[in-house]
């Protein structure tokens, strides 16, 4: 599908650590989370989802939850960078 092909475009962006794609359906918003290094499965599990360490999915139901997911991902990324300074 189109949303999956967009993930592959995002993966080609060098220096990006986490990619998040929101796909809106009638009653829900599906979230695709991908990462090169930062584990994203714990983010997905907080939002009705799961998957693999670096490729996960979740479901949110409104813009407030979308914003909360983005804030959660930002915090995860900040923590990852501070715990792994040699990578940056």
Task: Locate predicted features.
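Gly/His-enriched, cation/cofactor- and phosphate-binding structural elements
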Residues: 1-88
